Amino acid sequence: MDRPGFTASLVAGGVAGVSVDLILFPLDTIKTRLQSPQGFYKAGGFYGVYAGVPSTAIGSFPNAAAFFVTYEYVKWILHTDSSSYLMPVTHMLAASVGEVVACLIRVPSEVVKQRAQVSASSGTFHIFSNILCQEGIQGLYRGYKSTVLREIPFSLVQFPLWESLKALWSWRQDRVVDSWQAAVCGAFAGGFAAAVTTPLDVAKTRIMLAKAGSSTASGNILSALHAVWRTQGLSGLFAGVFPRMAAISLGGFIFLGVYDQTRSFLLELGRESP
């Protein structure tokens, strides 16, 4: 990948990540509280829906930038012809590697954010300090495996579907899709991926919110899923599915639309520069 492409992916990914995370933060808080083991109202209900936003604001840009730089770089390395039947596999591999890298940045900010969302009376820095003092660095990375195991299936669905929908729309209109069309494709792809991966999101939330030393805090995603199934059944596994779908559909529209528009703008700017 050339330098302009690298820079465009880096900046566009970061801008898209910050935009979507800050706009949709209240929906994410409601979803987290619905999935909390203490229950929606005890976790804060509709009060303080921006609790934990500093953690998200700090982590959004580097997290999204890391994902898209990796995603575009892996696609460039594999360099599959656009007409090839292997193209969806390329997108799957690129998205998977991108998630593994991005989660190194995402998980610490996610741990702090989710604890702040269910403890609205505690400040972000106070929660961050407590985690470091009581659990060390590993506390900030609690749920890394469950997050990766949630994000990879999500991206395996979302990104190939997004790329396929864009390709289909381009073929139907005989020209490359506009940024708003890429955003619409992102909304459909994101909403569908969100629905089918909700149980993994529930397990990830339970692991991150569990008390240190508890069996759930160990990070075993199958045990977390089994515990939810045993106590709450299917409704527990799909807790928060509608706000999650709403947030990620709208998020897909904003995130992938802003990314596509910003990257195209930066590449065009680079071509016009002397």
UniProtKB/Swiss-Prot annotation:
InterPro entries noted in UniProt: Mit_carrier, Mitochondrial_sb/sol_carrier, Mt_carrier_dom_sf
Membrane topology: Multi-pass membrane protein
Pfam families (alphabetical): Mito_carr (PF00153)
Origin: domain of life: Eukaryota
Ranges that cross the membrane: 5-25, 49-69, 85-105, 142-162, 182-202, 238-258
Protein's cellular compartments: Mitochondrion inner membrane
GO cellular component: mitochondrial inner membrane
PROSITE patterns cross-referenced by the UniProt entry: SOLCAR
GO biological process: mitochondrial S-adenosyl-L-methionine transmembrane transport; S-adenosyl-L-methionine transport
Keywords tagged on the record: Antiport, Membrane, Mitochondrion, Mitochondrion inner membrane, Repeat, S-adenosyl-L-methionine, Transmembrane, Transmembrane helix, Transport
One MF annotation (Gene Ontology) recorded for this entry: S-adenosyl-L-methionine:S-adenosyl-L-homocysteine antiporter activity
Placement of Solcar repeats on the sequence: 4-77, 86-168, 177-265
Catalytic reaction list: S-adenosyl-L-homocysteine(out) + S-adenosyl-L-methionine(in) = S-adenosyl-L-homocysteine(in) + S-adenosyl-L-methionine(out)
Family designation: Belongs to the mitochondrial carrier (TC 2.A.29) family.
Entry function: Mitochondrial S-adenosyl-L-methionine/S-adenosyl-L-homocysteine antiporter. Mediates the exchange of cytosolic S-adenosyl-L-methionine, the predominant methyl-group donor for macromolecule methylation processes, for mitochondrial S-adenosylhomocysteine(SAH), a by-product of methylation reactions.
PANTHER family in alphabetical order: S-ADENOSYLMETHIONINE MITOCHONDRIAL CARRIER PROTEIN
Official protein name in the record: Mitochondrial S-adenosylmethionine carrier protein
Organism: Bos taurus (Bovine)
Chain's gene name: SLC25A26
